């Protein structure tokens, strides 16, 4: 009998070792959207509760817990932010809403069994934002400077396709307060070179996706536009002034031609 009782802890240990939590997938969720993290335990065991934690320094933080006794309990800082959907003791799904950069990271799904024993798995979340882009052209007498800008998360890659791919260009980037990366590449095209093509294409790549944005350096110089507008305004003012002088002169001539004679003004005069 004593040998039986001695072997019971070893049996329990072997039983726990056979348990496994499945999940651990890497999930992507759109910024300001939602994402679902899922885990399950096989085979089914005597689980009393399931706890979701977020890994961070100096230690993990509880997000939400489910048990038959208390149902779903979400920690204060995650209320209106996260929830356990389809609650169960052998599988669990944590949904996070209104995703921001701070939500990115890895989460622990912990199955708690009798005796305080635990089986866990890890699911990691990546917050993404599909790229957007546009082209800016700045022209001077010496050169046309064309800049292609792209904003996204993870950082997008910006390149110039042929024929501008051989032109001198530089790429820079920075991350804004929302965690989005703004990347841009500038190409300088000297004027007076007849071999320089007037049209090019900016390529923005982001994972397996790509965006093509056409660019052109045709048209008037950017710095000439204000001067041209000023000239047109001056001509318009001059024309208005001349029209006013002409109208006033015409009105005076008309009044002078219709002036009454002295005889018309004295009805009592006799011959």
From Swiss-Prot:
Pfam families: V-set. Residues 26-129 form the Ig-like V-type domain. GO terms for biological process: heterotypic cell-cell adhesion. GO terms for molecular function: cell-cell adhesion mediator activity. Residues 249-271 are cytoplasmic. Glycans are attached at residues 83, 91, 138, 157, 166, 208. Interacts with human CD200R1. This is OX-2 membrane glycoprotein homolog. It comes from Human herpesvirus 8 type P (isolate GK18) (HHV-8).
């Amino acid at each position: 009998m004593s040998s039986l009782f001695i072997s019971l802890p070893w049996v329990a240990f072997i039983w726990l070792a056979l348990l496994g939590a499945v999940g651990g997938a890497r999930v992507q969720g759109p910024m300001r959207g939602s994402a679902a993290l899922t885990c399950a335990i096989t085979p089914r065991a005597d689980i009393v509760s399931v706890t979701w934690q977020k890994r961070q320094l100096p230690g993990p933080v509880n997000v939400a817990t489910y048990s038959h006794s208390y149902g779903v309990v979400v920690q204060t800082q995650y209320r209106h932010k996260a929830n356990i959907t389809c609650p169960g003791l052998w599988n669990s799904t944590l949904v996070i809403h209104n995703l921001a950069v701070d939500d990115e990271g890895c989460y622990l799904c912990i199955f708690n069994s009798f005796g305080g024993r635990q089986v866990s798995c890890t699911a990691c979340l990546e917050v993404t934002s599909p790229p957007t882009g546009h082209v800016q052209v700045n022209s001077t007498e010496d050169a046309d400077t064309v800049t292609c800008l792209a904003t996204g998360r993870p950082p997008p890659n910006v390149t110039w396709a042929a024929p501008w791919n051989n032109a001198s260009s530089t790429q820079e980037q920075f991350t804004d307060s929302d965690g989005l990366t703004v990347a841009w590449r500038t190409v300088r095209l000297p004027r007076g070179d007849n071999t320089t093509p007037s049209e090019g294409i900016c390529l923005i790549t982001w994972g397996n996706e790509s965006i093509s944005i056409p660019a052109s350096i045709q048209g008037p110089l950017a710095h000439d536009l204000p001067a041209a507008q000023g000239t047109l305004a001056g001509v318009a003012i001059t024309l208005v002034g001349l029209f006013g002088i002409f109208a006033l002169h015409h009105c005076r001539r008309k009044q002078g031609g219709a002036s009454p004679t002295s005889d018309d003004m004295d009805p009592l005069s006799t011959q």
